[in-house]
């Protein structure tokens, strides 16, 4: 992220030093081009390790989220409005692993962008779109869990497939329209023309964002984050109260309807806990990056490049975390993975398989 040069003075040489090495150790991204960016390659050992770490994250994000989507969309037992939200969230994380992480990996390790100016803007737009899509999905998932835990018996009539579809459509449309409009209209660079000119070279993909839009980006993260934290605080208070009520009942015989309600409430609390962990993981992964973006915008390039790269990749790695969370907490997901990996999903009527323990 960049600072607004109309309000904060900046030194062109110091800015260029973030991307260009001194001439004494110069290596160019494109050796035969005069306006080539200068690269700072890692030695073979660290280079190999970084490719392995970043590549593993990308593969895990793609394969793990593909398993989540396949499980939910194939097995009829998983066809529920809440699970469709989870599948759509997995789609956003899948696309991060497919369209963002591999290209960021090369840029981070090589110090150069080899994929052209057109895809540079696409890459940045994809990055923003899928990140904001994820946080909007998680916000709606939080609301879904609150309704499910607070009143599990009427929940199916309130959070319907139609409501889920509207939540999914809103999450995708708003994030895509916002991110692509931001980078393709050039409003993010308003007031930073000299800075953009100084940073422009062949083999670079530097997107400058002025203070106003950095602040808006931060709010688009912060407001849903505060909503989610508030909702989950209420969820856990309700869950605690329900647990206390069940404990008071002890071994007394309850009516069948009450027993059924207790079982439903217990199931919904478990789902809320698992998805709450996914929400917490997302917030913890991306919060450092968004805080850093504010610091960089208002104090002016105080974050070292390597720190910025670490923060970005912590955020990217979140796209690979949700499948691991589901696999750890959900027996049905582990069973679905086994059926998919062994090819049993191709059998006739496999979509009717019972994934839940008796």
UniProtKB/Swiss-Prot annotation:
It comes from the Eukaryota. Gene3D superfamilies: Rhodopsin 7-helix transmembrane proteins. The chain crosses the membrane at residues 48-68, 84-104, 126-147, 167-187, 212-232, 275-295, 310-332. GO terms for molecular function: trace-amine receptor activity. Its main location: membrane. PANTHER family: HISTAMINE RECEPTOR-RELATED G-PROTEIN COUPLED RECEPTOR, TRACE AMINE-ASSOCIATED RECEPTOR 7A-RELATED. GO terms for biological process: G protein-coupled receptor signaling pathway. Residues 69-83, 148-166, 233-274, 333-358 are cytoplasmic. In addition to the well known disulfide bond common to G-protein coupled receptor 1 family, trace amine-associated receptors (TAARs) contain an unique disulfide bond (Cys-37-Cys-201) connecting the N-terminus to the extracellular Loop 2 (ECL2), which is required for agonist-induced receptor activation. Glycans are attached at residues 34, 210. GO terms for cellular component: plasma membrane. It is a multi-pass membrane protein. The lineage of its organism: Eukaryota, Metazoa, Chordata, Craniata, Vertebrata. This is Trace amine-associated receptor 7b. Belongs to the G-protein coupled receptor 1 family. The keyword Glycosyltransferase does not apply. Residues 1-47, 105-125, 188-211, 296-309 are extracellular.
């Amino acid at each position: 992220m960049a600072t607004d040069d109309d309000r904060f003075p900046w030194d062109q040489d110091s800015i260029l030093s973030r991307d260009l090495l001194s001439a004494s150790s110069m290596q160019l991204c494109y050796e035969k081009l005069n306006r080539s960016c200068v690269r700072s390659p890692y030695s073979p050992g660290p280079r190999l390790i970084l490719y392995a770490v970043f590549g593993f994250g990308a593969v895990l994000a793609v394969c793990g989220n593909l398993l989540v989507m396949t499980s939910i969309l194939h097995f009829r037992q998983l066809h529920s409005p809440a699970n469709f939200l989870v599948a759509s969230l997995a789609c956003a994380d899948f696309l991060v692993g497919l369209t963002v992480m591999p290209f960021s990996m090369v840029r981070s390790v090589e110090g150069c962008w080899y994929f052209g100016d057109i895809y540079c803007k696409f890459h940045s737009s994809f990055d923003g779109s899928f990140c904001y899509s994820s946080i909007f999905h998680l916000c709606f998932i939080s609301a879904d869990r609150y309704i499910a835990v607070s009143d599990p018996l009427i929940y199916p009539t309130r959070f319907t497939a139609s409501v889920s579809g509207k939540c999914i459509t809103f999450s995708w449309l708003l994030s895509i329209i916002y991110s692509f409009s931001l980078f393709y209209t050039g409003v993010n660079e308003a007031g930073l023309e000299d800075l953009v000119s100084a940073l422009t070279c062949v083999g670079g993909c530097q997107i400058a964002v002025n203070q106003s839009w950095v602040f808006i980006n931060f709010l688009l993260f912060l407001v849903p984050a505060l909503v989610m934290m508030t909702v989950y605080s209420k969820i856990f208070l309700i869950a605690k109260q329900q647990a206390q009520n069940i404990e008071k009942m002890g071994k007394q015989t309850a009516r069948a309807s009450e027993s059924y309600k207790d079982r439903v409430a217990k199931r919904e609390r478990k789902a809320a806990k698992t998805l709450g962990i996914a929400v917490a993981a997302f917030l913890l992964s991306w919060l450092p990056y968004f805080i850093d973006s504010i610091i960089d915008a208002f104090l002016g390039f105080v974050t070292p490049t390597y720190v910025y790269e670490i923060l970005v990749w912590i955020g990217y790695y979140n796209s690979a975390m949700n499948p691991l969370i589901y696999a750890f907490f959900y027996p049905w997901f582990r069973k679905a993975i086994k059926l998919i990996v062994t090819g049993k999903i191709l059998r006739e009527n496999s979509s009717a398989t019972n994934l839940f323990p008796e």
